[in-house]
A protein has these predicted regions:
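Membrane-embedded helix-loop-helix hairpins and adjacent transmembrane boundary segments
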Residues: 1-671
Length: 671
């Protein structure tokens, strides 16, 4: 009965949304496009989510934490897919495929493979014990307050990093489509997050996530079909876009061999060589460059120079590295960026393109390391694993994972198609155009977000060359309809889908953090006699506080969305995967072993990120060497083995678990 009612309700909702899109399209054709379309596509869905959240409000403890454990498997799979398909997937993944080609398939393969691990290794056993949170599961398995506290801290850390990435995505969407400042867009998005989760907890989040999945999947399938038909690929290009790949490969070869392109790349190499000279002359070059800026600013002020130039020099001086050590980090990054732009275009179809085996091997290692981290991180994310506690039974949890994979596959089969089509549009319609006739979308995006796209005439010939286009991956999806020449209503649809992806994941993460604080720390460690009503109230207050703090951190714009997501996966894998797997499948795992494994994995992962990621190196002035050339986004490849090794060794050296613990593991292992 419940399933039939849900199918009827969400079918009507889907038809209503598609009719809403068609209506706006007709209005645009009749009255013309404008920023009002962006407002409508952002605020009308938020209003719908608010209504669902209001109707799902509850103060019942089981409803608030796990939606009453009565969510049908198909709908839980849809909600989990929405929880999973974050701003990084929607905004960043197609951009990474566009920029790096084959290398970005690590995200698709890693994330999809992770759900196989969820199905076979964890979801049924987590559901069998039927706890409210993952720290609750581990605290019960090891009968330890220390394990619970440590797991709660790790869940808060990895979820918070992931949450910041989602809120940054919301800020980017609001900035582009309603024209507000990035920070204001973030706090507008905060309201959207809270209306979905504040009143109803997991119950409200579940039903809003189902609604959000319908919007986000429509927002990827419809534009892909429209752009494909424009390129002669038909309305379902997911299984037949090889012809377009051949056209892209041919144009990439032309760009690679073009003399003008080589002149542009030579210009970047000369700029990189100049920066290398400055690096070689440190610290003298630091004092010289800083002195030059100070002298220029003083001269402009003395001669009443233009306010714009004075402001530019003041900003440059404020952003100048604080000491020679920080200058080395910043200038090294600038040199590397120039050298990357000086490289020939990366062929989309070719695995690990490189001039030699010495260049290819690090790329292969990083591909495998990232794939591994994403797979293990997927199987360890608390906000994903907790979703399977909302199903009606262990068997339903297994079926729910299958539905999750199906709904995610609908999205992931479309993303590579979009990346290929947008790359073809850029190569065919932007490269080779005169600078005097740049498309409107280039100037508009550069006006709103100059860091996302820039086209500079490096060799002064008045023609746009591939190497002169600097386009951040995060803008590829949001700008796709404009790049392909589609109506602005399709851009609004993309914005609604991106917002749905960011909100759905942000809601799940926010609830995970608030529940870890209220249930695992407040209830189990501070006030075990607290009433159910008080526990729900505390969770709501904490949810509001965490949302405000995460929005503030996101407004600082601390890193690329895709990097923040990758870091969250590495943190989750390093802290949770060893102890979850050992806790379920090895009775010999002890409390001390679990604590040692979690601490070791987390410390190794955090150290590697902080010591090798340029943003942190700039903050601290310390830049450590990479291990085996592995990038910081894949730090979990070191944290997970360290966590397993330490947990196993300490458990073997410790006393065996008692009879109760062994019986509990047997109970968990027979779902």
């Amino acid at each position: 009965m419940l399933t039939r009612r849900l199918i009827r309700a969400y079918a009507l909702y889907t038809l209503g949304f598609l009719g809403f899109v068609l209506l706006l399209g007709r209005i645009e054709r009749a009255a013309g496009s404008g920023v009002w379309i962006g407002y409508v596509f952002l605020f009308v869905p938020i209003a719908v989510y608010a209504v669902i959240g209001l109707l799902s409000r509850t103060s019942d403890l089981v409803e608030y934490y796990v939606a009453g454990r009565r969510v049908p498997s198909a709908f839980n799979g849809m909600a989990t897919a929405a929880d999973w398909l974050s701003a990084a997937s929607f905004i960043g993944l197609a951009g990474s495929l566009y920029a790096t080609g084959y290398d970005a398939l690590a995200y698709l393969m890693g994330w999809t493979g992770g759900f196989c691990l969820v199905a076979f290794l964890l979801a049924p056993y987590v559901r069998k014990l039927a706890r409210y949170t993952i720290p609750d599961f581990l605290g019960t398995r090891f009968s330890s307050t220390a394990v619970r506290a440590l797991a709660a801290g790790a869940a808060i850390l990895c979820s918070f990093v992931y949450l910041v990435a989602q809120i940054q995505g919301i800020g980017l969407i609001a900035t582009r489509f309603i024209g507000v400042d990035f920070a204001i867009g973030i706090f507008c998005g905060l309201a959207g997050i809270l209306v979905c989760s504040f009143l109803g907890g997991m119950r409200a989040v579940t039903w809003t996530q189902v609604a959000q999945y319908i919007i986000l999947i429509s927002a990827i399938l419809i534009p892909v079909s429209l752009i494909a038909m424009k390129n002669g690929l038909g309305p379902v290009p997911q299984f037949g876009y090889g012809q377009l790949m051949e056209r892209v490969a041919a144009r990439e070869a032309q760009v690679r061999d073009s003399r003008d392109e080589q002149r542009v790349r030579d210009a970047y190499r000369r700029q990189a060589a100049h920066i290398q000279t400055q690096l070689d002359r440190l610290p003298a070059s630091y004092a010289q460059e800083r002195g030059r800026l100070v002298d220029q600013l003083a001269d402009l002020r003395r001669h009443n120079g233009p306010l714009r130039e004075i402001s530019q020099r003041e900003r440059a001086l404020a952003e100048f590295p604080r000491d020679p050590a920080a200058a080395r980090v910043v200038w090294s990054q600038a040199r590397d960026d120039l050298l990357a732009r000086a490289a020939p275009p990366v062929p989309m179809h070719e695995p690990f393109p490189a001039a030699s085996d010495d260049e290819r091997r690090p790329r292969e290692r990083n591909f495998l390391a990232l794939l591994l981290c994403l797979s293990l991180g997927t199987a360890s994310l608390p906000h994903i694993l907790t979703r399977y506690n909302t199903t009606t039974s262990v068997a339903s949890a297994r079926r729910s994972v299958g539905w999750t994979l199906f709904f995610i596959a609908l999205f992931y089969l479309s993303v590579p198609v979009l990346a290929v089509m947008i790359k073809y549009e850029i190569l065919a319609n932007l490269v080779g155009r005169p600078f005097a006739a740049l498309p409107a979308w280039v100037t508009q995006w550069h006006h709103f977000e100059p860091d996302l796209i820039g086209v500079v005439d490096e060799i002064r010939d008045g023609i746009v060359h591939w190497s002169e286009i600097q386009m951040q991956p995060d803008m590829v999806v949001l700008a796709a309809p404009e790049i392909a020449g589609l109506p602005y209503v399709v851009s609004g649809l993309i914005a609604a889908g991106a917002l749905a992806a960011a909100l759905s994941t942000a809601d799940g993460l926010l609830l995970t953090i608030a529940n870890a604080l209220s249930h695992d720390i407040y209830y189990h460690m501070v006030a075990p006699d607290a009433s159910s009503q008080r526990r729900v109230t505390i969770s709501k207050v904490l949810l509001l506080g965490v949302a405000l703090f995460a929005s503030y951190v996101a407004s600082l714009n601390t890193g690329k969305i895709l990097f923040l997501v990758g870091a969250a996966f590495s943190l989750a894998a390093s802290s949770f995967f060893p102890v979850l797997v050992l806790g379920v499948f090895w009775k010999r795992t002890t409390t001390r072993g679990a604590i040692a494994g979690m601490v070791t994995g987390l410390v190794v992962c955090v150290y590697y990120i902080v010591s090798t990621y340029p943003y942190f190196a700039q903050l601290t002035g310390f830049a450590g060497p990479t291990w085996f050339g592995i990038e910081p986004i894949s730090s979990g490849v070191f944290g997970v083995p360290a966590g397993f090794a330490v947990a196993i060794v300490v458990s073997l050296l410790d006393r065996r678990s008692d009879d109760y613990t062994r019986a509990l593991v047997d109970y968990i292992r027979h779902p």
